[in-house]
Structures are given as C-alpha cells and as structure tokens.
C-alpha cells in the first residue's frame, strides 16, 4: 500500500475524498496549481507565469463585449454531412453538447466601449475550431452585417484549419470569407484580426491574416503547417520560438502582441481611432 493512501480521508461510504472536480487547475506551462475561480477572475491567465489559457467563445464575449450588448447571429445554421463521413454527425452533436455552441464560431453584434461592432469568435473546444461550411458561412454573414451597419468587424481566431470531413467545401470557405472581407475593406471599414492559440491551416492562410490590423495574444502558435511537419520536410531544426506570436511580430507578420489584460482597452482605442463612417458612396 502506498504511504500517501494511509492519510487520505474517506467519506461515509468508505470512498476516498479528493478535491471537488474543477476546483483546481494546473498550468501546463509552469505546472503551478491555481484555484479555478482565481484563474477565471484573471481572464484565464496564469498568475505565476502569465500563460494564456484557451478561452471559450462565451468567455470572450463576457470579457470583451460591453455587458448586455451582445446579440448572437445565425445560430440556426446547422452542419450537414455532405461526404457521408462516418460518425461526423455524431461528433458534431457531442461538440454542441460540450460547448453550448451550434458550431465552432460564435458571431454577433455588440458594443465595445460604446462603439458598435460585429464580432466573430472561434472556439477551439468545438472540433478544434476547424472551419467547415457553416463556420465559413457564419463568418461571411457577419462581415456582410458589418457592411450593412457600416461598422468594424473583429474576428478572434482559434483553429486547427479546414475541416477534413467536408473536403473541398471546407477549403472553399477560405475564398468566401476573404472575398467578403475584401468588400468590407472597399467600403473603407475596419477589420481587426486577433489571433489566439492556436491559429493554423486554412484559417491562418485566409481571413486571419488579412486584417487591417493583425494582433495576437502572447505565445500563440500561428502558422500553416505544424512545426514537426516543416522540420521533417526541410530536414533542419527550426528556432525554438518559431511560429510563436512574438517571432511573427519580430519578422513583420503581426502589428502587435497584447497581453489579455490589455487587449480589450487597446482594441477599443483602435476602433475609436478608425471609426468615423468609412467611404461614403454617392
């Protein structure tokens, strides 16, 4: 018998007691044990090492958008199984139950420090934030709504890339979203892309990288192919910080890297600086 088991308390049924599930969270970076409640108060940033934990779409709305102002859009859109991929429908159903989302992106209209915006927030907890036809359609409709309202669009990306279960239909979303953003740009309207960990594949190669202002959170991994694939293809070792947001900033691929505690205020300031009407067509 292990010595530590002698000191474990038992409940009335003789079962060993432990911490209530969800009470504590271990930081994957520094291994520090945090009270989950304190972690959430700190916007899911480790108080010991500043590691930025992944956030759900709902958590980002609560943190980023003015309280009570967010109205979601297009939640009725449902994913089908165009290629009859085995178990795909079941996996989508499980993801819906686990996340409370209809798909891997939450879109809607709200205000940021009083300024009206349209926002799209990807959630990597839903099938790794992969982009299928519904994700692409929701982002496209969000951009079109921003054009209609003549307001900025802000997109938070967190994705493993295009969704393989939808084949070419998922790849088509790269073009569709980019074209919608081109129309938004032609109207003289602001698009801020905020890349969070991870942003990869078809998402990084399309709408995530074409913002008027491209921002990332600290230590976010951003790229097309993964590090291991690139190293095996090139047969050479890559820098330790390769594909991290700070590396991309140093090499001109990003405009800024903001700590999560500063992100809301910095983006609100950028929106106020750039929001006065856009191009007026006669």
Curated annotation (Swiss-Prot):
What does the Swiss-Prot or TrEMBL cofactor note state? Binds 1 zinc ion per subunit.
Pathway, per record? Lipid metabolism; malonyl-CoA biosynthesis; malonyl-CoA from acetyl-CoA: step 1/1
**Span of zinc fingers (C4-type):** 27-49
- Record-annotated disulphide pairs: none
Quote the EC number: 2.1.3.15
Binding of Zn(2+), residues? 27, 30, 46, 49
Q: Which GO terms describe its cellular component?
A: acetyl-CoA carboxylase complex
Q: Which reaction does it catalyse?
A: N(6)-carboxybiotinyl-L-lysyl-[protein] + acetyl-CoA = N(6)-biotinyl-L-lysyl-[protein] + malonyl-CoA
Compartments in which it is found: Cytoplasm
The UniProt GO MF terms for this protein read: acetyl-CoA carboxylase activity; ATP binding; carboxyl- or carbamoyltransferase activity; zinc ion binding
For biological process, the GO terms are: fatty acid biosynthetic process; malonyl-CoA biosynthetic process
Q: Which cofactor does it need?
A: Zn(2+)
Listed under subunit, the entry gives: Acetyl-CoA carboxylase is a heterohexamer composed of biotin carboxyl carrier protein (AccB), biotin carboxylase (AccC) and two subunits each of ACCase subunit alpha (AccA) and ACCase subunit beta (AccD).
- Free-text function comment from the UniProt entry: Component of the acetyl coenzyme A carboxylase (ACC) complex. Biotin carboxylase (BC) catalyzes the carboxylation of biotin on its carrier protein (BCCP) and then the CO(2) group is transferred by the transcarboxylase to acetyl-CoA to form malonyl-CoA.
What is the protein name stated in its UniProt record? Acetyl-coenzyme A carboxylase carboxyl transferase subunit beta 1
Instruction: Say which species the protein is native to.
Output: Lysinibacillus sphaericus (strain C3-41)
Q: Taxonomy-wise, where does this protein's organism fall, top ranks first?
A: Bacteria, Bacillati, Bacillota, Bacilli, Bacillales
What gene name is listed for this protein?
A: accD1
């Amino acid at each position: 018998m292990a010595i530590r088991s002698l000191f474990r308390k038992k409940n009335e049924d003789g079962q060993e007691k432990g911490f209530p599930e969800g009470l504590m969270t271990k930081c994957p970076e520094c291994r520090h044990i945090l009270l989950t409640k304190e972690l959430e108060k700190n916007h899911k940033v480790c108080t010991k090492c500043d590691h930025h934990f992944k956030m759900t779409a709902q958590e980002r709305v609560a943190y980023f958008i003015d309280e009570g102002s967010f109205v979601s859009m297009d939640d009725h859109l449902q994913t089908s199984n165009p290629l009859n991929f085995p178990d795909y429908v079941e996996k989508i159903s499980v993801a819906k139950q686990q996340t409370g989302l209809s798909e891997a992106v939450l879109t809607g209209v709200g205000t940021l420090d009083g300024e009206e915006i349209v926002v799209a927030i990807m959630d990597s907890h839903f099938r790794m934030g992969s982009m299928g036809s519904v994700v692409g359609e929701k982002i496209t409709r969000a951009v079109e709504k921003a054009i209609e309202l003549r307001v900025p669009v802000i997109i938070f990306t967190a994705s493993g890339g295009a969704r393989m279960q939808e084949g070419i239909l998922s790849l088509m979303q790269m073009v569709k979203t980019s074209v919608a953003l081109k129309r938004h740009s032609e109207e003289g309207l602001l698009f801020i892309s905020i890349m969070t960990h991870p942003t990869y594949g078809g998402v990084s190669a399309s709408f995530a990288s074409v913002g008027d202002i491209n921002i990332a959170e600290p230590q976010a991994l951003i790229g097309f192919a993964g590090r291991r694939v690139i190293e095996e293809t090139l047969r050479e070792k890559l820098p330790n910080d390769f594909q991290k947001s700070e590396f991309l900033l140093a090499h001109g691929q990003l405009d800024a890297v903001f700590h999560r505690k500063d992100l809301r205020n910095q983006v609100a300031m950028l929106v106020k600086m750039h929001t006065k009407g856009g191009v007026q067509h006669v």
